[in-house]
């Protein structure tokens, strides 16, 4: 499934910037403050449980704690989840839903010919891309557990594997001044994503879910997985990324 290839948006080896409240303090007080912040950071990094029947990588823990999400316990009622905003939910304790229980809306019967299929990356890039699915699956992969909510209808907590947008943008070499990505799919469906803050989200183009090839009704060959956004923005049958 490529679980060992966890290259999601935050780059590996990223340096975490600790609290700077010690500026202007004495050397002894500075040392105590640095110790306190490191200890508290480590407390946040350990003890993350793995739930469900699949071992998935959680990627790099975000250093932005300003907007705390609500941590939900294992077994939290689905009838309550479907009324919630995914941007407010910490889903790390929730079970992985069996794939045969996944709900879906929108187009479900579009057939893609892999012989001619290409994912294009165009717009403000130095190196436009036109990639087959085989070429895409050979790029560094990432596996992430992300919650999909169709408000009032269904909720899917899935383990998604694919290529991160960051990886694709590195291949295409985004030009200075670029601000947005337009993710396009079948039936002219488009979702716009700001480049600012892209590295702090779990965002990828998935070709597998719960260790299985992404089925046609869920957007094969590529589906946008977009943390903190409702399922209506998770474009299916993705075939183009336009940088603007």
What are these regions (language model features)?
Residues 65-244:
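Structured, non-membrane catalytic/scaffold regions adjacent to prosthetic-group chemistry
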Residues 31-32, 41, 126, 155:
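Short, flexible active-site loop motifs that bind/organize anionic cofactors or intermediates
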Residues 1-40, 50, 54-56:
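N-terminal secretory signal peptides
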Residues 33-43, 62-63, 69:
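Twin-arginine (Tat) signal peptide motif
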Residues 46:
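Short, locally clustered residues in the helix-turn-helix/winged-helix DNA-binding domain
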Residues 49, 61:
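Iron-sulfur (Fe-S) cluster-binding modules
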